[in-house]
Curated annotation (Swiss-Prot):
Pfam families in UniProt: Ribosomal_L20
GO molecular function: rRNA binding; structural constituent of ribosome
Record gene name: rplT
Coiled-coil positions: none
Listed GO CC annotations: ribonucleoprotein complex; ribosome
Function statement: Binds directly to 23S ribosomal RNA and is necessary for the in vitro assembly process of the 50S ribosomal subunit. It is not involved in the protein synthesizing functions of that subunit.
GO biological process, one term: translation
Record-given protein name: Large ribosomal subunit protein bL20
Phylogenetic classification of the source organism: Bacteria, Pseudomonadati, Campylobacterota, Epsilonproteobacteria, Campylobacterales
Keywords for this protein: Ribonucleoprotein, Ribosomal protein, RNA-binding, rRNA-binding
Family named by the database record: Belongs to the bacterial ribosomal protein bL20 family.
Amino acid sequence: MRVKTGVVRRRRHKKVLKLARGFYSGRRKHFRKAKEQLERSMYYAFRDRKQKKREFRSLWVVRINAACRMHNTSYSRFMHALKVANIELDRKVLADMAMNDMQAFKSVLESVKEHL
């Protein structure tokens, strides 16, 4: 009997099983289970790339708010004052300042103090 998909099937299986490394038990060793788990993992990866952006933004907000409250103001008032003072620093930079360079964050806070 002639096998028409011998090389092609081997390559396809090899590719799927290579991508399934690190999965648990049969999901790593058996082609069908590996393929199903791979589809699910690709779905998770796609979904979580979007979720990651939301999670980081909320983390930055929490950090900025904590730093603001140390200086007796709130996050919302601080962000409004930044907008009024026409200072265009994004939340990522502000959160990094709040965590690693408190002096710089304090100077930004002082510069918008009149707009609070």
